Amino acid sequence: MKVLSLIFVLFSVLVLFASAKDPVCDQPKAVGRCFAAFPKFYFNSSSGQCEAFIYGGCGGNENNFNTLEECNAKCA
């Protein structure tokens, strides 16, 4: 019975860690302070989806992905 309880606890911990979202995904959209126009994607924590935006090319934050697939893999 103790072994079964231990297995259950370990499984629960693994599920919690696997479902933990990367803190990058909670950062706001940041277009940057320059004036280029690069199409990028960010995770919108309000809508729970990755969305397109135009990145200025410098500054910003880590919630900035080159492809929709990359954004979804990290955050969705």
Swiss-Prot record:
SMART domains, per the entry: KU (SM00131)
Range of residues in the leader sequence: 1-20
Claim: Magnesium is one of the keywords in the record: no
CDD domains in the record: Kunitz-type
Domain BPTI/Kunitz inhibitor as annotated: residue spans: 25-75
Classification via InterPro entries: Kunitz_BPTI, Kunitz_BPTI_sf, Prtase_inh_Kunz-CS, TFPI/VKTCI-like
Keywords: Blood coagulation cascade inhibiting toxin, Disulfide bond, Hemostasis impairing toxin, Protease inhibitor, Secreted, Serine protease inhibitor, Signal, Toxin
GO cellular component: extracellular space
Pfam family, one: Kunitz_BPTI
GO MF annotation list: serine-type endopeptidase inhibitor activity; toxin activity
Main location: secreted
Disulfide bonds: 25-75, 34-58, 50-71
Expression sites by tissue: Expressed in salivary glands.
Intracellular or extracellular location(s): Secreted
Highest rank taxon of the organism: Eukaryota
UniProt entry tagged with the keyword Lyase: no
Function: Potent anticoagulant protein that inhibits the hydrolytic activities of all serine proteases tested (trypsin, thrombin, elastase, and chymotrypsin), with the highest efficacy on thrombin.
Identification of the protein by name: Tabkunin 1
Biological source species: Tabanus yao
